[in-house]
Amino acid sequence: MTIASSNGSNYSQSPLIPDLADAITPRPDRNTNNGRQADVFPPKEEHIEEMKDAVRKIILGVGEDPEREGLLKTPKRVAEAMRFLTSGYNQSLEELVNDAIFDEGHNEMVLVRDINFFSLCEHHMLPFMGRAHVAYIPNQKVVGLSKLARIVEMYSRRLQVQERLTRQIAEAIQTILEPRGVAVVMEASHMCMVMRGVQKPGSWTVTSAMVGVFQEEHKTREEFFNLIRHQPAFF
């Protein structure tokens, strides 16, 4: 499910509509190229000079002087920033989880909500940022709570579209835990809609991905949506 809204919408809160939740069909970790998995490799150190040269060309392209004092170190700074913002390519799900899976016999919903995230839109390489809500219903096994936030972080630190990002997080949790169900909702503001193009400050996009009982059972979805709408009393 994907929901987009902007100022002037009739919704007073995120319009999460359980009946429209989508099922997930597993697919490759990254986007595909003509049906084949795209050739994407972890960045190499020698590429940093190529990135710096590219930034210099961009500076020239916008009519600036890359040799003036304020811009002398900009290519290096931008290259390093891009490496950080896409550091998720250097991580793998197996290394991230690091065997932090435990047999607890727990079979009720586990939810980590309001996980702040930042990512880069792959179309314009502009930021989008927001909050993720991640839940699963264990099949006896649980994972360390921080790992759910780290999974969100790993996939966010790549060139992304929000729809795929949401799906990848759900599929990752399904892969490591084989739970009875997984639910992920992400709410984000996209700078490519705010700073350029349609230029709509205040617009936001909601995406959801449902697996297993969250997709199959209305009551389970409704419980999840109610929990992420609920405002904790201790904050």
From Swiss-Prot:
Domain of life per record: Bacteria
Cystine residue pairs: none
Record NCBIfam families: folE, PRK09347.1-2, PRK09347.1-3
GO cellular component: cytoplasm
EC number: 3.5.4.16
Pathway the protein contributes to: Cofactor biosynthesis; 7,8-dihydroneopterin triphosphate biosynthesis; 7,8-dihydroneopterin triphosphate from GTP: step 1/1
Family designation: Belongs to the GTP cyclohydrolase I family.
Cited PROSITE patterns: GTP_CYCLOHYDROL_1_1 (PS00859), GTP_CYCLOHYDROL_1_2 (PS00860)
Annotated stretches, region: Disordered: 1-42
Protein encoded by which gene: folE
Protein name: GTP cyclohydrolase 1
Lineage of producing organism: Bacteria, Bacillati, Cyanobacteriota, Cyanophyceae, Nostocales
Biological source species: Nostoc punctiforme (strain ATCC 29133 / PCC 73102)
Reaction(s) catalysed (UniProt annotation): GTP + H2O = 7,8-dihydroneopterin 3'-triphosphate + formate + H(+)
Residue ranges the record marks as coiled coil: none
